[in-house]
Amino acid sequence: MFPEHARIENRFEWISYSVSDEAVAVETQGGNLNAEKVRIALEHALALWGVAAPVAFRPAGPDEEPLIRIRFTREGASALNLGNTSGHVDRTPAGPYGAASIRINCDNDLFVDRFFESDRHQTQPGPYDLVAILAHEVGHALGIEHPPTDPATGSESEGGIMSDSVGNAVLRQLLPYDVREVQARHGTIRVAETVGADLAATGRLIDPAGEVSLQVAGRELVLSGAMGSSALLDVLVPARGRVVNAIRLAFTLVTRNVLVNRVTVFDGIVPVQELAVSARAADNDGIAGKRFDLRLGLLRRPRAASDMLVRLQVFFTRAGGQPESDFGVLQLHDVAVETLPLPIEVAREFEPS
């Protein structure tokens, strides 16, 4: 079943973590966050690093000392720091070594669903992306520093999740600097193959609200809708029996009034992970729209018992009341799963004791 090159075993570095005081994040954000959103943000942030390196995060057991402690706090002042990390975890032949403590400053305004949460304090900096903040601090816990500064300009030489600069944009993908640094410290993940979906055969609209239509365009799908409408778009990927590391999505928001808010992944009908994508074109993206090529890591890396169902939550809504078209268009180019090169007999590595 597995090709010969797929019989190279990834040596995963199991990193235990604990999370405390999530209620602080909920209570400080004026209704914008809830416990589910905080969980989604944390799982998304942890899974980002596993896309590039063989690191695997798991909750610490009841009597286990976690390697990474994450705590949501109030620091007494906003915008002074978004988070801080002390200590880090190294990869060693005997397993991960070290410890790190992360604090997330909830006195700042934070968001998960960028375009559905109110800007509570328009006269102060923010709001800030909770997924990016968590991913940044986890990067420090893995031993990664900020990008170096160019002496000539005083600016960082590269951008990335690990950038020290703070903005209120959505950033939920590793950039080249992040990938190089995590692979230098924790190794490079070995991928077996990428298995794509037959979009034309498996694409389905679920629970459309309002005027929404789905059309086949060659091997791709085109989803369009009137303003105020929404739908779930389901696609099946033939992944049965494979260990899935990440989901790959490629789509173009042809018009600015389209928002892909969440992506939910199922093993058949069993939920695997929900990811907050918050993908939307911006004012400066031009008349051709904006293309997104996303690589969404899965925290638990399931061995699929069935085909993987990938569900996109799509809204057709104007951005900030802009005088845009009365309909929006999304073109879906590709949905695929990235599988790991593990034969059946070593897949048990994904079930730590």
Residue ranges of model-derived segments:
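Extracellular Ig-like/FN3 beta-sandwich strand-entry sites
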Residues: 305-309
